[in-house]
Regions:
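Polar/charged low-complexity regulatory segments
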Residues: 2-186, 193-253
Length: 253
């Protein structure tokens, strides 16, 4: 693992001058032009939005997974059956009630899947990790960091410094899922979303930074480049499309 970290650090240094990433970005753009535009990810909206401006802002922090699950970005309502939510929450996180829901919120906030990734990232970039096990996710962090730079998702100097947005997006969605499972009240759901929003504002200064960290964390989660690519496609739609809550709601609103 230490060899992997040294190799990753060397790779990062080699990419600092920007020539390789520029060449790869141009090749990628040319390929997309040749292939033509794809249908892409749809940003769905409720026929009638019943949310306040503040509620819409909080929902925006959940947007990447709402789009991934083909749900409206401005509606609490869901077509999924409550028993489906209950089964999924128990399968994913052993959530069965209010207390276990709030326990997972705290776990995602303070550890989740970002702690080990952040430790590996800090070591790879020449720093010292504050927590987590850097060797646990070293290979996955190197793989996804190189993938994001090579594909023009970021430059070496704008590589995310944390994978926490992956866990924060899940916190924001968990609040809503737990509401529909019958474990949280609507007021508690908004409080959980506020936890995600407050943490996001602490770590990031823009929707772009938040989205880039989400894509990085999603990829590192299973060390899967396709997961990272899918996440970045969704993030790109949120950053670029006029109907996106990320275009309509300022980061510091």
């Amino acid at each position: 693992a230490r060899h992997n970290m040294a190799q990753a650090a060397a790779t990062m240094q080699a990419m600092q001058d920007g020539s390789l990433e520029k060449e790869l970005r141009e090749a990628n753009a040319a390929a997309l032009d040749w292939l033509g535009e794809e249908d892409g990810w749809e940003i769905r909206h409720a026929a009638t939005c019943r949310l306040t401006a503040e509620q819409r802002r909080l929902m925006a922090f959940a947007a990447p997974l709402l789009i991934y699950n083909d749900e409206a970005v401005d509606a609490v309502e869901s077509e999924v059956l409550p028993e489906t939510y209950r089964a999924q929450l128990q399968s994913w996180w052993n959530i069965t009630d209010r207390d276990s829901t709030l326990g997972i919120v705290q776990w995602l906030l303070h550890e989740g899947h970002h702690a080990d990734a952040d430790a590996a990232l800090a070591l790879m970039c020449g720093g010292q990790p504050d927590a987590g096990d850097p060797e646990e996710k070293a290979e996955d962090v190197q793989l996804i960091a190189e993938f994001m730079i090579e594909n023009g998702y970021c430059r070496a100097e704008t590589l995310p410094q944390t994978a926490i947005a992956w866990d924060l997006v899940r916190i924001a969605n968990l609040g809503r899922w737990a509401l529909h499972a019958g474990y949280l009240s609507e007021e508690e759901m908004w409080q959980v979303m506020q936890v995600a929003a407050d943490a996001a504002r602490e770590y990031f200064s823009s929707w772009e930074e938040y989205g880039r960290s989400f894509a990085f964390g999603r990829g590192v989660w299973h060390g899967d480049e396709e997961d990272c690519q899918t996440a970045w496609e969704i993030v790109s739609a949120l950053l670029e499309e006029e109907t996106s809550p990320w275009r309509q709601i300022p980061w510091n609103a």
